[in-house]
Amino acid sequence: MSRSETLFANAQKHIPGGVNSPVRAFRGVGGTPLFFKHAEGAYVIDEDDKRYVDYVGSWGPMILGHAHPDVLEAVRRQLEHGLSYGAPTALETEMAELVCSLVPSMDMVRMVSSGTEATMSAIRLARGYTGRDSIIKFEGCYHGHSDSLLVKAGSGALTLGVPSSPGVPAAFAKHTLTLPYNDLGAVEKTLAEVGREIACIIVEPVAGNMNCVPPAPGFLEGLRAQCDQHGVVLIFDEVMTGFRVALGGAQAHYGVTPDLSTFGKIVGGGMPVGCFGGKRAIMECIAPLGPVYQAGTLSGNPLAMAAGLTTLKLIGRPGFHRELAEYTGRLLQGLQERADAAGIPFVTTQAGGMFGLYFSGADEIVTFADVMASDAERFKRFFHLMLDGGVYLAPSAFEAGFTSIVHGETELSITLEAAERAFATLAKA
């Protein structure tokens, strides 16, 4: 048995499914999940000392690569002053100032400890601000595991083949309307009928939890116009896209300004952090200024603020996001060329430093239906062939991939050589 197999067997005795987040269990690809013991730069190393080029990046945060020395040093410095105070710090104010300066829509921001907490709080705030109960989300989009959002959710719920989670009361779900992603007509029709009941529309500006589906031309702009027309709060869930698609997030990249935004992953530099913010008039409704309650023992944790601040400052250098997108584009071009040469139906998508891989004969991937029509079984085989070649992809056909700024020529060569062998093997199957 490998060390990972031994550890997984033991983990299952004490941890449900042997993991602390479902997608890590490899149910989407089969086999035993890898247990990692070290990560550095563009690589992760498992418990059997096998080294892999990493395109998961801890599900997005590691845009600088793993164990960046400046981030580690910032955390070490803060460690000497304590782990947590449960009180305001200069670091959290500095973080708030930086986030508001980088993101076009942010007048004020509140720090929390996860992306789920950020989206949950933003929706509560939108409901409190508007006095309305119902919300709109989109099929295949995932906004964390709070009850009102696990309604036809993507990500892990999609991989497990369930449209919503047991344990979510019908009374919660009835206030969540789920519409097709990239279908502006469905939004227009729904708001024409029940717009007065809708507190907010929450959307991933790039749907990163049904792999990676960019917005159709005019979709985000149309959402903005519809929200303005019906007095609905527009929330961009930028937990995944924030500071990755562009320094100012997807909203800066696509030129559409939401009322509220949620962030996670990169904003914590690898530590457990989320935040939400937006227009001052809305944010001033939250406690202690207003009646909408939100709180958190570890919100603004100084260790996390140190890691996040350092990360955001480093990715702000000129040319950073252009270089990240260029590498990602070269990676996808190389994969597409090798799939085509092997006669394998294959489509890629890209939004800056995030990407999607689909075994599909479609010309493009635009909708949830397009995603579901892709060949998940072929992806499973591809995943393990790439793993054998020293490349770690997301262990699910429905999760986006991520590059970092330290992925370079060596990593590109390793990846494309492994892919060429993998596509050739698939072509013979």
Swiss-Prot record:
Superkingdom: Bacteria
Database matches in SUPFAM superfamilies: PLP-dependent transferases (SSF53383)
Residues recorded with modification N6-(pyridoxal phosphate)lysine: K265
GO-annotated molecular function: glutamate-1-semialdehyde 2,1-aminomutase activity; pyridoxal phosphate binding; transaminase activity
Cofactor(s), names only, from the UniProt record: pyridoxal 5'-phosphate
Main location group: cytoplasm
GO cellular component terms, A-Z: cytoplasm
GO terms, biological process: protoporphyrinogen IX biosynthetic process
One matching Pfam family: Aminotran_3
Reaction equations catalysed: (S)-4-amino-5-oxopentanoate = 5-aminolevulinate
Record keywords: Cytoplasm, Isomerase, Porphyrin biosynthesis, Pyridoxal phosphate
HAMAP family: HemL_aminotrans_3
Subunit structure: Homodimer.
Protein name: Glutamate-1-semialdehyde 2,1-aminomutase
Species this protein is from: Azotobacter vinelandii (strain DJ / ATCC BAA-1303)
Organism placement in taxonomy: Bacteria, Pseudomonadati, Pseudomonadota, Gammaproteobacteria, Pseudomonadales
